[in-house]
Amino acid sequence: MYAQKFQVDVWIRGERQSCPLEWLDQFCMRNFTNAAEFDDTLPVSDGCVEASFRLTPERFAEGLGAWLTQRGKGEGEPVRVEARRT
């Protein structure tokens, strides 16, 4: 069902880490994002998401970064997200 896999890393206060599965789960649920483009996503593990071809890694990173920053996950700083196809 899912056509591609993304490796998702977050940068918080200059430190890189795999995005926690809990954050990916919450973000990919439509009632949190209210965006249909994230409907066809499946968080698999820390730092790993499967997605349809409707979604680009760049758009996923942009949306997740804004969402994490809005929720204060960056400890007062913007959260930078990198997503790439694996």
Model-inferred region functions:
Residues 1-86:
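Charge-rich, low-complexity N-terminal segments
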